[in-house]
């Protein structure tokens, strides 16, 4: 995890998917009923194939424009939710399958739960919150400013997917976009590799050295 920041918590503005039709839910979220298990598996395979195809496509020209529009709608930097000192570790309720929703990529961990940054209490019953863990292996050197940029992008993406189904697929879309954003920060020179990292494998490409071409002597 980035040593300069705590886990970032954002309100989840996504739609919850019920597991049992007769269960009651009082949160202000739309409800969707799942298909049978076989259809779930087929849909998951299809979604993974679609995600792989999307990641291989070049970014659309209007991507930067949409990003600027999301930042315009957001007033000021993203702020984390307040800490809950009395939070306890709880499993997700049975109506949602009793297992957490999460997205795990190389530098991003997203959980549909509340995680106390001090006690590490993992409350999965608070599905109206998303917790972001940034760079848990410390592959990059982070500052407060660069961490805040990732948090702002995370909040913008959550707002962008408002109303979408709260599922692992949606969280993977957010996580994939954040990975691309981190790569952009690296290529722009805003972050750099942590040469003291426990695992040094340059997952986003080998370091680039900038030099002044005018200082290269002519070969005669």
Curated annotation (Swiss-Prot):
Reactions catalysed, as given in the entry: a plastoquinone + NADH + (n+1) H(+)(in) = a plastoquinol + NAD(+) + n H(+)(out); a plastoquinone + NADPH + (n+1) H(+)(in) = a plastoquinol + NADP(+) + n H(+)(out)
Transit peptide: 1-37
Pfam families attached to this UniProt entry: NdhM
Organism: Oryza sativa subsp. indica
Biased composition (Low complexity): 34-44
Annotated region (Disordered), positions in chain: 20-91
Protein EC: 7.1.1.-
Protein task: NDH shuttles electrons from NAD(P)H:plastoquinone, via FMN and iron-sulfur (Fe-S) centers, to quinones in the photosynthetic chain and possibly in a chloroplast respiratory chain. The immediate electron acceptor for the enzyme in this species is believed to be plastoquinone. Couples the redox reaction to proton translocation, and thus conserves the redox energy in a proton gradient.
Domain of life the protein comes from: Eukaryota
One GO MF term: quinone binding
Annotated protein name in UniProt: NAD(P)H-quinone oxidoreductase subunit M, chloroplastic
Locations listed in the record: Plastid, Chloroplast thylakoid membrane
UniProt-listed InterPro entries: NdhM (IPR018922)
Top EC group: translocase
PANTHER family (alphabetical): NAD(P)H-QUINONE OXIDOREDUCTASE SUBUNIT M, CHLOROPLASTIC
Subunit structure, as described in the record: Part of the chloroplast NDH complex, composed of a mixture of chloroplast and nucleus encoded subunits. Component of the NDH subcomplex A, at least composed of ndhH, ndhI, ndhJ, ndhK, ndhL, ndhM, ndhN and ndhO.
UniProt family annotation: Belongs to the NDH complex subunit M family.
Keyword list, A-Z: Chloroplast, Membrane, NAD, NADP, Plastid, Plastoquinone, Quinone, Thylakoid, Transit peptide, Translocase, Transport
Membrane-topology annotation of the record: Peripheral membrane protein
Gene assigned in the entry: ndhM
Lineage of origin: Eukaryota, Viridiplantae, Streptophyta, Embryophyta, Tracheophyta
Main location: plastid
């Amino acid at each position: 995890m980035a040593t300069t920041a705590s886990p970032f918590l954002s309100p989840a503005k996504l739609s919850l998917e019920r597991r049992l039709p007769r269960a009651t839910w009082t949160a202000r979220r739309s409800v969707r009923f799942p298909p049978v298990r076989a259809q779930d598996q087929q849909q998951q395979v299809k979604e993974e194939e679609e995600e792989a195809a999307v990641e291989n496509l070049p970014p659309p020209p209007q991507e930067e424009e949409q990003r600027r529009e999301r930042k315009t709608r957001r007033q000021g930097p993203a702020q984390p939710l307040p800490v809950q000192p009395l939070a306890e570790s709880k499993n997700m309720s049975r109506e949602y399958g009793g297992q957490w929703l999460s997205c795990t990529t190389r530098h991003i961990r997203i959980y549909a739960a509340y995680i106390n940054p001090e006690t590490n209490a993992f409350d999965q019953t608070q599905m109206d919150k998303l917790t972001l863990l940034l760079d848990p292996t410390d592959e990059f050197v982070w500052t407060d400013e660069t961490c805040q940029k990732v948090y702002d992008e995370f909040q913008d993406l959550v707002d962008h997917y408002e109303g979408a189904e709260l599922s692992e697929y949606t969280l993977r879309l957010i996580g994939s976009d954040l990975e691309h954003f981190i790569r952009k920060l690296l290529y722009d020179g805003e972050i750099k590799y942590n040469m003291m990292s426990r695992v040094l494998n340059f997952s986003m490409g080998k370091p680039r050295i900038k030099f002044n071409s005018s200082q290269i002597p002519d070969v005669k």
